[in-house]
From Swiss-Prot:
One of its GO terms (molecular function) is metal ion binding. The keyword Transmembrane applies. This is Fluoride-specific ion channel FluC 1. Fluoride-specific ion channel. Important for reducing fluoride concentration in the cell, thus reducing its toxicity. It holds the Pfam family CRCB. It is a multi-pass membrane protein. Na(+) is not transported, but it plays an essential structural role and its presence is essential for fluoride channel function. It comes from Carboxydothermus hydrogenoformans (strain ATCC BAA-161 / DSM 6008 / Z-2901). The keyword Signal does not apply. The lineage of its organism: Bacteria, Bacillati, Bacillota, Clostridia, Thermoanaerobacterales.
């Protein structure tokens, strides 16, 4: 039961932060590329990589890894925006968005792991 509470607490905070950042970025950026979701997923990938690299205890992992970053990042929105770009006839912009998001997510996850290892003295 405690596990579910930790995940729920972290997830709700992550989802609220994602919503807030999406609104703030949307107020400043009016382009046709899904910048908010892209940035949020990059930040989330980095943070999750950092958390993973520190190999913290299960309680922190459930609160932050599964909960917070699970609520903060969003695969469903990523797919929705890709489909939307396709429906708008923006094929190459869609391909760019999909590939850039995947590549950048992997790079930022690895960067987070590297930074965690650096701080632990393992690099």
């Amino acid at each position: 039961m405690v596990d579910l509470l930790l995940i729920g607490l972290g997830g709700s905070i992550g989802a609220i932060l994602r919503y807030t950042l999406t609104k703030k970025i949307g107020e400043r950026y009016q382009g046709d590329w899904p910048l908010a979701t892209f940035l949020i997923n990059i930040i989330g990938s980095f943070g999750l990589g950092l958390l993973y690299g520190f190999k913290l205890n299960q309680v922190i992992w459930l609160l932050l890894g599964t909960g917070f970053f699970g609520g903060f990042t969003t695969f469903s929105t990523y797919i929705y925006e890709a489909i939307f770009l396709m429906e708008e006839g923006l094929f190459w912009k869609n391909v760019n968005y999909l590939l850039t998001s995947i590549f950048t997510g992997v790079v930022f996850f690895a960067a987070g792991m590297w930074l965690a290892n650096f701080f632990k003295g393992g690099v």
